[in-house]
């Protein structure tokens, strides 16, 4: 096996593939990437057995073959080469040599046969989604995913495929984020899958937000996303996601409309004196005004007052200020709408004019 390639042509696909490779592995071969040459095409594959990333690029002076090479070392070498360098790669025995100008490197390898790959998935459905749209949906909801929760099905994101379109939903049990879009190409059936947290983060890193289309393939146990020369595959979380629609407080009659940026900056200031552990702030509504109050164990206090469009006369409720700030940061609207039933119920937060992005935040007892 041998090939030649410009540094810049190799660096981008290599960077995408190396991202999924964990630094500490139980299997030595998982610290490597699979390098395959076939008919002048170089395919790079990295995996951690949960997520797989595969990228392809054309090369010169190619001889077919396959081997696995230490991922991090190869990436560091290519990144450190001079701009415009031509890299020659040649396999000899159980070593691979890399030549670029006056630089020469020799790396240990492992057989390609030892590398675990996901070749085919049991495809049950697929949709075309604008890349920028899918990235936007995931960015607006990913922050609400749980991390290492014993309820393993919360450690990821729900993709809810339905007749009307696609929804991305994430929750950690304390707050919920939902974003949806309509799809031009209707799906054959409704379907729900849960992508693990790492898969979501890798997908967000993969998307550039360009104008292209991403093909999303739904398998029984896997999700696959095809984008240009890159194929991303992730195992799915085998669990049942909570009935998130039951969590959304529909029909909440206590409504406040506020300037998003004014509310966000007021909460940021109040958060300075909130309890560092619970991050609690108290929202007090009366006579067209919202009062934000924060205290800490040192008996220090922060008070912020904002004008609000509301018919609510008297209401006081506590929230984790970090959850409110995350939700507001996800909304792009000038004005936001807060909807509540009472002082013990959750808050529905969305744009004042549209509801494609919705957030639910559970209250705190202060």
Where does each model-flagged region fall?
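Structural preference for solvent-exposed beta-strand-turn elements
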Residues: 1-366
């Amino acid at each position: 096996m041998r090939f030649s390639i410009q540094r810049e042509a190799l660096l981008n696909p290599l960077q995408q593939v190396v991202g999924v490779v964990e630094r500490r592995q139980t299997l030595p071969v998982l610290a490597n990437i699979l390098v395959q040459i076939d008919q002048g095409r170089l395919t790079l594959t990295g995996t951690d057995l949960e997520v797989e990333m595969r990228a392809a690029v054309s090369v010169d002076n190619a001889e077919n073959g396959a081997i696995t090479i230490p991922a991090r070392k190869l990436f560091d070498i290519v990144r450190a080469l001079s701009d415009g360098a031509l890299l020659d790669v040649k396999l000899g025995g159980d070593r691979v040599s890399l030549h670029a100008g006056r630089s020469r490197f020799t790396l240990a390898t492992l057989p390609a046969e030892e590398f675990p790959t996901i070749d085919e998935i049991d495809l049950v459905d697929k949709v075309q989604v604008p890349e920028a749209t899918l990235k936007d949906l995931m960015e607006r909801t990913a922050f609400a995913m749980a991390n290492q929760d014993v309820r393993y099905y919360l450690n990821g994101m729900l993709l809810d495929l339905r007749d009307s379109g696609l929804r991305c939903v994430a929750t950690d049990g304390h707050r919920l984020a939902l974003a949806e879009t309509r799809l031009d190409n209707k799906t054959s059936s409704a379907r729900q899958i849960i992508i693990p947290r790492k898969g979501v983060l890798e997908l967000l890193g993969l998307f550039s937000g360009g104008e292209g289309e991403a093909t999303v393939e739904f398998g029984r146990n896997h999700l696959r996303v095809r984008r240009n020369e890159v194929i991303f595959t992730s195992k799915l979380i085998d669990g049942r996601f909570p009935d998130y629609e039951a969590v959304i407080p529909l029909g909440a009659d206590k409504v406040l409309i506020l300037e998003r940026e004014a509310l966000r900056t007021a909460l940021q200031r109040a958060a300075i004196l909130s309890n560092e552990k619970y991050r609690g702030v108290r929202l007090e509504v009366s006579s067209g005004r919202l009062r934000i109050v924060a205290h800490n164990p040192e008996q220090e206090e922060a008070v912020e007052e904002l004008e609000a469009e509301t018919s609510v006369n008297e209401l006081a409720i506590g929230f984790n200020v970090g959850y409110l700030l995350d939700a507001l940061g996800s909304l792009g609207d000038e004005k936001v709408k807060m909807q509540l039933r009472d002082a013990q119920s959750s808050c529905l937060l969305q744009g004042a004019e549209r509801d494609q992005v919705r957030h639910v935040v559970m209250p705190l007892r202060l």
